[in-house]
Amino acid sequence: WIMGHMVDAIAQIDEFVSLGANSIETDVSFDKNANPEYTYHGIPCDCGRTCTKWEYFNTFLGGLRKATTPGDSKYHEKLVLVVFDLKTGSLYDNQAYDAGTKLAKSLLQNYWNKGNNGGRACIVLSIPNLDHYKLITGFKETLTKEEHPELMDKVGYDFSGNDDIGDVAKAYKKAGVTGHVWQSDGITNCLLRGLDRVRKAVANRDSSNGYINKVYYWTVDKRASTRDALDAGVDGIMTNYPDVIADVLSESAYTAKFRIATYDDNPWETFKN
């Protein structure tokens, strides 16, 4: 999965997919009542990027739905996965459940079209704080209450705080999550980060009793670091330059082992090294 980083304006969906992304990451900020409000990152952000592009969250979902609904004039067949980077740092811990509830209602209405031919991409809820695991509970219980529990088949999870792998496992246990787990590891492109924790995450994925299904590394903009991440066995790379990742994947060293995921590839299924 080539994951376009910080796609916060509808116009950027076309831009990143045309550069080779089959997945995008979108920032979601919340108001003080835990309503998802904007797709917005803000300053500071990655080096070389404009930090202030934004839409209202529900407006963005409408654009995303069009981009992932077959037959729509804006449809992109290859856009199959969306990571929502949920900026829950502005919330109190006890608002996490409400945030999950409100997020589910927004997606149900504006992305899934109440279960009637909505957008088809799979969604990863990426949460920065392990203490906010109840966001998952709120999300799940709301879809059940709204009589669309089947949409949970399209939803996965990520805790993005670079926490100890054992602590992440405990948070999932509390949330009752037993699959659909992506594990991120990374840092802004302005700084360097080694691959030690990525290797631990890959080892967990590849073990018989691990909780991780997929591992992605962020934010990778250079060919050398792309090769290092692929050599470590990641499933996804988040980048500001999807064309760079696509170029490296076309090198002879990688074409035999990796291919770009399509809609038919299950993003919750584990492939071991």
From Swiss-Prot:
Mg(2+) binds at residues 25, 27, 85. Expressed by the venom gland. CDD domains: GDPD_like_SMaseD_PLD (cd08576). It is found in: Secreted. GO terms for molecular function: lyase activity; metal ion binding; phosphoric diester hydrolase activity; toxin activity. GO terms for cellular component: extracellular region. Its main location: secreted. The active site is at residues 5, 41. Binds 1 Mg(2+) ion per subunit. The keyword Cytoplasm does not apply. The keyword Hydrolase does not apply. Its EC number is 4.6.1.-. Its cofactor is Mg(2+). InterPro entries: PLC-like_Pdiesterase_TIM-brl. Keywords: Cytolysis, Dermonecrotic toxin, Disulfide bond, Hemolysis, Lipid degradation, Lipid metabolism, Lyase, Magnesium, Metal-binding, Secreted, Toxin. One of its GO terms (biological process) is killing of cells of another organism. Disulfide bonds join 45-51, 47-190. It catalyses: an N-(acyl)-sphingosylphosphocholine = an N-(acyl)-sphingosyl-1,3-cyclic phosphate + choline; an N-(acyl)-sphingosylphosphoethanolamine = an N-(acyl)-sphingosyl-1,3-cyclic phosphate + ethanolamine; a 1-acyl-sn-glycero-3-phosphocholine = a 1-acyl-sn-glycero-2,3-cyclic phosphate + choline; a 1-acyl-sn-glycero-3-phosphoethanolamine = a 1-acyl-sn-glycero-2,3-cyclic phosphate + ethanolamine. Belongs to the arthropod phospholipase D family. Class II subfamily. Dermonecrotic toxins cleave the phosphodiester linkage between the phosphate and headgroup of certain phospholipids (sphingolipid and lysolipid substrates), forming an alcohol (often choline) and a cyclic phosphate. This toxin acts on sphingomyelin (SM). It may also act on ceramide phosphoethanolamine (CPE), lysophosphatidylcholine (LPC) and lysophosphatidylethanolamine (LPE), but not on lysophosphatidylserine (LPS), and lysophosphatidylglycerol (LPG). It acts by transphosphatidylation, releasing exclusively cyclic phosphate products as second products. This is Dermonecrotic toxin LsaSicTox-alphaIB1bii. It comes from Loxosceles sabina (Tucson recluse spider).
